[in-house]
Curated annotation (Swiss-Prot):
Residues 321-407 form the PPIase FKBP-type domain. Keywords: Isomerase, Nucleus, Rotamase. This is FK506-binding protein 3. Residues 65-88, 103-136, 236-252 have a biased composition (Acidic residues).
Length: 407
């Protein structure tokens, strides 16, 4: 049993029922896992006998024969010492055997062999009897005593490994139930650790063999290192030669060329200074102003109609009798849009035929295709005092017109 319970890792619950008069092993051979027993509890149901005897849990284990083995070892050593000492009688017997003929020697040897065999047989029987006596010795140890009258259970802390030869037995009138845990004990891991260590040693040996390195003597190391140092010195010498050649190959500049180059550099510096000054002046003036947009020219036509050309356009100009297609947006003086044609079919009318208000007939004349114009029409050239949906009476109207077609 082990006391190293703090280093044990619980794996699963463990239970065992021990009935009176029936020894039971704590660990099954089919499941060799260490266990830690932490509780012993009595079953109040009486099993044996009419009297209510308390139940005592015992551990049974073979007796330790360390003293007997030591005694046997001492006896064996004494026997060996006696055998090493040759008596005078034995020496005389040996001389007689040497002097005898071969036949007599064979008979004497045969007789001695028979006697030795008989003695060996007697020794074996005696040893067997001693072994039988030792094997029959069983020691028992009391773990706890429980009774329904004075104690139902007892806390324990027993760790049992698969290698231990022990059994539990109960004496009394009641069964005792043990509980605890199956555990991962360090003892169980020793074999695995040894195998892993052996495997690592083998891998290390293989790595050393694979590297193909040999242990060289100091003289051989000096020779190899000396060769490497020689190669390094030769390479360094080659590099120095190359540097010398590079220095020799640099062209010699004539004094005239140097002066000429210096003069050119001075000119470039002066030009750079001028550029810097000019650039600085521009910066002081602020960002480059955008090109001023041309002012729109407003022209006043018949009846007070005013026009402003935004885009001149191209092609022939519209005149009286021309049929033009236009896009337009009509606004009041306050900027409110009351009519427009910006998509779909353009609006077509004949110029000067009275198909539109008078301000349109006058304001569209002279426009070209893709031309854009703003036409400002006073009330007298529009709808006058007439009130229309979205157009109050006496309203000044402004139209932005674009010609898309002239026929």
């Amino acid at each position: 049993m082990s006391n190293n319970a703090n280093n044990c890792l619980p794996l699963a619950s463990y239970t065992l029922a021990v009935f009176p008069g029936i020894p039971v092993a704590p660990i099954e051979q089919d499941f060799p896992v260490s266990v830690r027993i932490t509780m012993a509890a009595i079953d109040p149901a009486r099993i044996e006998g009419d009297e209510e005897e308390p139940a005592t849990l015992r551990i049974l284990k073979p007796a330790d024969n360390f003293d007997d083995e030591d005694d046997e070892d001492d006896e064996d050593e004494d026997d060996d010492d006696e055998d090493d000492e040759v008596s005078a009688e034995d020496m005389a017997q040996i001389k007689k055997l040497i002097a005898a003929n071969e036949d007599g020697l064979d008979e004497v040897e045969g007789g001695d062999d028979d006697e030795d065999d008989d003695e060996d047989d007697e020794m074996e029987f005696e040893e067997d009897d001693e072994d039988d006596d030792d094997e029959g010795e069983i020691e028992d140890f009391v773990v706890c005593t429980l009774s329904p009258k004075f104690g139902y259970q007892q806390t324990l802390d027993l760790v049992i490994t698969p290698g231990e030869q022990i059994m539990f037995e109960v004496t009394g009138s009641y069964a005792i139930h043990l509980s605890g845990n199956y555990i991962e004990h360090p003892y169980d891991m020793e074999d695995e650790d040894e195998l892993l260590a052996l495997g690592e040693d083998d891998e290390d040996d293989e790595d050393e063999l694979d590297e193909g390195e040999y242990d060289l003597s100091p003289d051989e190391d000096e020779v190899i290192n000396g060769d490497e140092r020689l190669v390094e010195l030769m390479e360094q010498d080659d590099e120095d030669d190359e540097d010398d050649e590079d220095e020799e190959e640099e062209p010699v500049v004539e004094p005239k060329k140097i002066l000429k180059r210096a003069a050119e550099e001075k000119k470039q510096e002066k030009a750079a200074k001028k550029a810097k000054v000019a650039f600085t002046k521009n910066l002081e003036q602020g960002p480059t102003p955008s090109e001023p947009k041309p002012k729109l020219v407003t022209r006043q036509l018949e009846g007070g109609v005013k026009i402003e050309d935004r885009t001149v356009g191209e092609g022939p100009s519209a005149k009286v009798g021309s049929k033009v297609g236009v896009r337009y947006v009509g606004k009041l003086a306050n900027g409110k849009v009351f009519d427009s044609n910006s998509k779909g079919k353009p609006f077509y009318f004949s110029v000067g035929k009275g198909e539109v208000i008078r301000g349109w007939d006058i304001g569209v004349q002279g426009m070209k295709v893709k031309g854009e114009r703003r036409i400002i029409i006073p009330p007298g050239m529009a709808y006058g005092k007439q009130k229309l949906p979205g157009i109050p009476p006496n309203s000044q109207l402004t139209f932005d017109v674009k010609v898309v077609n002239i026929k």
